[in-house]
Amino acid sequence: MPKPRSDRNHIIYEIVTPVGSYIGVTAKTQTTVLKSLRARAAKHYYRARTETKTWALCQYLRTLEDKSEIDIRMHEMVRGKADAHARERELIRRYNPALNTDKRGA
Protein backbone atom coordinates (compact mmCIF):
# COMPACT_ATOMS: atom_id res chain seq x y z
CA MET A 1 0.00 0.00 0.00
CA PRO A 2 1.43 3.43 -0.91
CA LYS A 3 2.41 5.87 1.81
CA PRO A 4 -0.24 8.58 2.38
CA ARG A 5 0.68 12.08 1.28
CA SER A 6 2.12 14.26 4.00
CA ASP A 7 1.94 17.54 2.10
CA ARG A 8 -1.16 19.69 2.14
CA ASN A 9 -2.92 22.15 -0.09
CA HIS A 10 -1.91 25.79 0.15
CA ILE A 11 -3.90 28.76 -1.07
CA ILE A 12 -2.24 31.69 -2.78
CA TYR A 13 -4.45 34.68 -2.09
CA GLU A 14 -4.68 38.39 -2.76
CA ILE A 15 -5.97 41.08 -0.43
CA VAL A 16 -7.37 43.85 -2.62
CA THR A 17 -7.56 47.41 -1.29
CA PRO A 18 -8.05 50.90 -2.72
CA VAL A 19 -4.34 51.58 -2.10
CA GLY A 20 -2.98 48.42 -3.72
CA SER A 21 -2.93 44.70 -3.15
CA TYR A 22 -1.08 42.08 -1.12
CA ILE A 23 -0.24 38.55 -2.27
CA GLY A 24 0.27 35.82 0.31
CA VAL A 25 0.07 32.09 0.91
CA THR A 26 -1.66 30.07 3.61
CA ALA A 27 -2.31 26.42 4.29
CA LYS A 28 -5.84 25.16 3.69
CA THR A 29 -6.59 24.42 7.33
CA GLN A 30 -10.38 24.71 7.31
CA THR A 31 -13.06 22.61 5.61
CA THR A 32 -13.42 25.08 2.72
CA VAL A 33 -11.17 27.51 0.90
CA LEU A 34 -13.38 30.43 1.90
CA LYS A 35 -13.15 29.54 5.60
CA SER A 36 -9.36 29.25 5.33
CA LEU A 37 -9.16 32.64 3.62
CA ARG A 38 -11.40 34.28 6.22
CA ALA A 39 -9.27 32.80 9.01
CA ARG A 40 -6.11 34.15 7.37
CA ALA A 41 -7.68 37.60 6.90
CA ALA A 42 -8.69 37.61 10.57
CA LYS A 43 -5.12 36.74 11.56
CA HIS A 44 -3.73 39.60 9.45
CA TYR A 45 -6.27 41.96 11.03
CA TYR A 46 -5.48 40.81 14.57
CA ARG A 47 -1.72 41.22 14.07
CA ALA A 48 -2.18 44.67 12.54
CA ARG A 49 -4.19 45.72 15.61
CA THR A 50 -1.97 44.17 18.29
CA GLU A 51 1.57 44.59 16.91
CA THR A 52 3.44 47.75 16.00
CA LYS A 53 4.63 46.65 12.56
CA THR A 54 5.01 49.49 10.07
CA TRP A 55 4.36 47.22 7.10
CA ALA A 56 2.10 48.74 4.46
CA LEU A 57 -0.50 45.97 4.85
CA CYS A 58 -0.70 46.48 8.62
CA GLN A 59 -1.02 50.23 8.21
CA TYR A 60 -3.93 49.75 5.80
CA LEU A 61 -5.70 47.17 7.98
CA ARG A 62 -5.56 49.54 10.95
CA THR A 63 -7.80 51.94 9.02
CA LEU A 64 -10.62 49.38 8.83
CA GLU A 65 -13.46 49.22 11.34
CA ASP A 66 -13.85 45.44 11.14
CA LYS A 67 -12.10 42.40 9.68
CA SER A 68 -15.19 41.71 7.55
CA GLU A 69 -14.15 44.69 5.38
CA ILE A 70 -11.12 42.80 4.08
CA ASP A 71 -11.49 41.79 0.41
CA ILE A 72 -9.52 38.54 0.14
CA ARG A 73 -9.55 36.44 -3.04
CA MET A 74 -8.04 33.11 -4.00
CA HIS A 75 -5.48 33.14 -6.82
CA GLU A 76 -4.76 29.44 -6.95
CA MET A 77 -4.34 26.24 -4.95
CA VAL A 78 -0.92 24.57 -4.83
CA ARG A 79 -0.02 21.18 -3.33
CA GLY A 80 2.98 21.34 -0.99
CA LYS A 81 4.51 24.13 1.08
CA ALA A 82 7.72 24.62 -0.92
CA ASP A 83 5.89 24.76 -4.26
CA ALA A 84 3.31 27.17 -2.85
CA HIS A 85 5.93 29.57 -1.52
CA ALA A 86 7.87 29.43 -4.79
CA ARG A 87 4.69 30.23 -6.74
CA GLU A 88 3.88 33.10 -4.34
CA ARG A 89 7.33 34.60 -5.03
CA GLU A 90 6.70 34.30 -8.80
CA LEU A 91 3.39 36.16 -8.50
CA ILE A 92 4.94 38.87 -6.33
CA ARG A 93 7.70 39.35 -8.93
CA ARG A 94 5.16 39.48 -11.76
CA TYR A 95 2.57 41.81 -10.20
CA ASN A 96 4.72 43.79 -7.73
CA PRO A 97 1.81 44.35 -5.30
CA ALA A 98 2.05 47.65 -3.41
CA LEU A 99 1.37 46.18 0.03
CA ASN A 100 4.00 43.42 -0.11
CA THR A 101 6.83 45.25 1.62
CA ASP A 102 8.99 42.14 2.17
CA LYS A 103 10.60 41.57 -1.22
CA ARG A 104 13.00 38.76 -0.16
CA GLY A 105 13.27 36.28 -2.98
CA ALA A 106 11.19 38.46 -5.25
Language-model region placement:
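GIY-YIG nuclease catalytic motif and its immediate N-terminal context
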Residues: 1-36, 71, 79-82, 86
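Small/flexible residues
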Residues: 7-10, 51, 75, 105-106
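Sequence-level detector for tyrosine residue identity
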Residues: 13, 22, 45-46, 60, ...
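Conserved short loop/helix modules at catalytic or binding sites
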Residues: 27-81
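Serine endopeptidase catalytic core focused on the charge-relay Asp
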Residues: 91
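Coupling/hinge elements of helicase-like and P-loop NTPase modules
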Residues: 95-106
